[in-house]
Structure formats: structure tokens, C-alpha cells
């Protein structure tokens, strides 16, 4: 059975096409949960985007789905808007530095 860390590692390969940073480093992936669905290992991934009007939403969601399938048999990507993404709170220190956000 896959672990949350394995799914996050797979998702780390997905980049925001505008920021050129990993969706995991940006803190866009909020949660990964597991369940058995029809005898298959299934993951539910809660993630958000940098903004509700993100022009690359479909591209990012599809890339996240494909990447997660490298770790689990079945996955559903849930697009959530709560909590609202804030790079000062959700992004890693390295991602904040790359975006020029200095605390």
C-alpha cells in the first residue's frame, strides 16, 4: 500500500507552469487520504490553485492526476478553495525565496 509521502513525492514532479515551482513546494496539495475502492488502492487528493481564475487549472489538475497514478492504482483530485492559498503560510521556505517573499 502506498503512503502519503509516496504520493507527495509523485506529485512533487508537477510544476505550476507560470511559477515553475512544484505544486507540493508551493503548498497547493492540502491532503492525501486513502481508501479501498472496488478492491483497488484509491487516493483522494485535496489541492488548490494559486487563484480561482488560474488559466492553467485544467493542465495542473490533469498533471497531478497522472503523477499520482505513479504511486496508487486509482486517484481522484479534489479541487478545494478552503483554506484560501497563501504563499506566506502554505509554501515551503525554498518556494517563498524563489518567489521573492521574505518574511
Question: What residue ranges belong to the model's regions?
Answer:
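Domain-level signature for proteins that mediate thiol-based redox and metal-cofactor handling
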Residues: 1-103
Amino acid at each position: 500500500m502506498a503512503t502519503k509521502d509516496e504520493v507527495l513525492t509523485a506529485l512533487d514532479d508537477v510544476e505550476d507552469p507560470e511559477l515553475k515551482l512544484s505544486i507540493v513546494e508551493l503548498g497547493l496539495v492540502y491532503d492525501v487520504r486513502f481508501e479501498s475502492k472496488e478492491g483497488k488502492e484509491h487516493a483522494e487528493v485535496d489541492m488548490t490553485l494559486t487563484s480561482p481564475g488560474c488559466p492553467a487549472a485544467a493542465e495542473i489538475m490533469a498533471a497531478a492526476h497522472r503523477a499520482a497514478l505513479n504511486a496508487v492504482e486509482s486517484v481522484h483530485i479534489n479541487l478545494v478553495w478552503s483554506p484560501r492559498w497563501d504563499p506566506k503560510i502554505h509554501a515551503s521556505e525554498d518556494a517563498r525565496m524563489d518567489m521573492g517573499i521574505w518574511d
